[in-house]
């Protein structure tokens, strides 16, 4: 079983990945943001580093999917390969932060990679409002995220909504997280578990 969690920056992907891995005894596959050599530079100069960052993420995400396909255990994944190509790169391109030449090159590489792997058994999308995202980002206090622009988050949210509505590659579950505090509230986490169990029947 491969379950993947998608959602904007600060939506709770990593937290839910950890909680589900602990609850079900699954292997977690986390997004490795702390060792990313481009992330801090990107937030300081998005236009200069956008292509480098997106290629780095695409490479790591493809390797993750290959590892998951070869794994003999159930895996819960924090962030999907789709989000890089369907959300982040197009958003950067539309904002003028990635050139058309780089974007077309990136899309071509993604199309090749995606033809070689299969989608997750269940895709969970964590839907969140911008105020909730901003609150969560400030709460966790990652230094490199302190300069995230609101218009950048808004653009991502719009693209997430468009993408998830059109997602037809496999089963999907949309969870509205603005009023769910699944880390602090066991009842909220139980609600999430029930939604997942119904979606995987």
Predicted regions located by residue number:
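Conserved substrate/cofactor phosphate-moiety recognition/catalytic segment
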Residues: 22-60
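P-loop (Walker A) phosphate-binding loop of NTP-binding proteins
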Residues: 8
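Conserved lysine of the Walker
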Residues: 13
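A glycine- and Lys/Arg-enriched "phosphate-lid" helix/loop adjacent to the NTP-binding pocket
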Residues: 87-161
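Post-Walker A alpha-helix
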Residues: 16-17
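NTP-dependent small-molecule kinase module
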Residues: 134-201
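Hydrophobic anchor at the beta1->P-loop junction of P-loop NTPases
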Residues: 5
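Glycine-rich phosphate-binding loop used to anchor ATP phosphates in small-molecule kinases
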Residues: 49, 53-118
